[in-house]
């Protein structure tokens, strides 16, 4: 059965789900939700995602929202199909879950307002909060130090294999690397830069970038 993904293919959170599907060889159909027109706030979409965000999915009777929960569900449901994204042991899965939580609570929590201020506000003609950006850059620098230390002794965030721990970071990292002037925060860190170069060369990621037509 083809999974329906409601969202905008260029948006970070839907990309997290789509990348999981591409790694797991899961068939999907993207139902475009135009964020610029605030279609995510309309009653029809609120039935799928009551907080007015994207993505949301429909898979037969199953309806889910929240990208990390969706990715974890499908990585578990199709554990033996495509790339193993969960970790091979109970302890390994706990470490993967830990870094998915780190991505949400520390990485994305800083990266999102950074990107909103340096990318999206200027595009919409709104002023960038320069003071906030400088404050966030200091916070982000400290967050990335933790990643640099982790990746000094591990090929990937979850250990020796590519998992959801790495996948969850990729949409946000793309904005930092490709659409802001902040890429130096990554390229100046040897281990973090090596990690990004490796994971962004994966076929599933390249396919997603083609679908998004960057």
Swiss-Prot record:
Residues 2-82 form the GST N-terminal domain. GO terms for cellular component: cytoplasm; cytosol. The keyword rRNA-binding does not apply. One of its GO terms (biological process) is toxin catabolic process. Its EC number is 2.5.1.18. InterPro entries: Glutathione-S-Trfase_C-like, Glutathione-S-Trfase_C_sf, Glutathione_S-Trfase, Glutathione_S-Trfase_N, GST_C, GST_Phi_C, Thioredoxin-like_sf. GO terms for molecular function: glutathione transferase activity. Keywords: Cytoplasm, Detoxification, Transferase. The keyword Transferase applies. Its main location: cytoplasm. Residues 89-214 form the GST C-terminal domain. It catalyses: RX + glutathione = an S-substituted glutathione + a halide anion + H(+). It holds the Pfam family GST_C. It is found in: Cytoplasm, Cytosol. Glutathione binds at residues 11-12, 40-41, 53-54, 66-67. Belongs to the GST superfamily. Phi family. May be involved in the conjugation of reduced glutathione to a wide number of exogenous and endogenous hydrophobic electrophiles and have a detoxification role against certain herbicides. This is Glutathione S-transferase F11. It comes from Arabidopsis thaliana.
